[in-house]
Amino acid sequence: MTRPTHPNALIWLLLSIAIIALDQATKAWVLTSLPEYIPVPVIHGFWNWYRSYNTGAAFSFLSDAGGWQMWLFIALALGISGLLTFWLSRTPRREWRSALPYALIIGGGIGNVIDRFLHGHVVDFIQWYVGSHYWPSFNLADSAIVAGAIGIGLLSLFDSKHSPKTP
């Protein structure tokens, strides 16, 4: 058996697994330690722990759709995670700028899928605010997804391989 000359980036799935584990551990802590819908200040005037639930997607999109949306979001997350895993298998290991965001999105997506299967909703608990302006509550899986999406966006903007060529 010959070794591939350029190992793929599937090793980055270890980061996805770590994100899933940390996400589920924090949510287990939230479910056993925080009261529902009561702010617990972390940094007064900016950050609370706030246990809440989201049956929808980002910003509670489709949260009142009647239940079918859970299966849509599970299918989307699994499909996107599968596609990104395939892309990781085609990405050389040394290309961390691509592999890192893919791994973040996979870990965050699967973390929220686990919530939907176990609870029928996603557990959120991080609440940021300034004065009376509150950002929607979120969790570590959401943070990983957003960081990964930002990474992909930055890569597409600044990576020389994807930049238009000048004559």
Curated annotation (Swiss-Prot):
It is a multi-pass membrane protein. It is found in: Cell inner membrane. The chain crosses the membrane at residues 10-30, 68-88, 98-118, 138-158. GO terms for cellular component: plasma membrane. Keywords: Aspartyl protease, Cell inner membrane, Cell membrane, Hydrolase, Membrane, Protease, Transmembrane, Transmembrane helix. One of its GO terms (biological process) is proteolysis. InterPro entries: Peptidase_A8 (IPR001872). Its main location: membrane. The active site is at D124, D142. Pathway: Protein modification; lipoprotein biosynthesis (signal peptide cleavage). Its EC number is 3.4.23.36. It comes from the Bacteria. Coiled coil: none annotated. GO terms for molecular function: aspartic-type endopeptidase activity. Belongs to the peptidase A8 family. This protein specifically catalyzes the removal of signal peptides from prolipoproteins. This is Lipoprotein signal peptidase. It comes from Xylella fastidiosa (strain 9a5c).
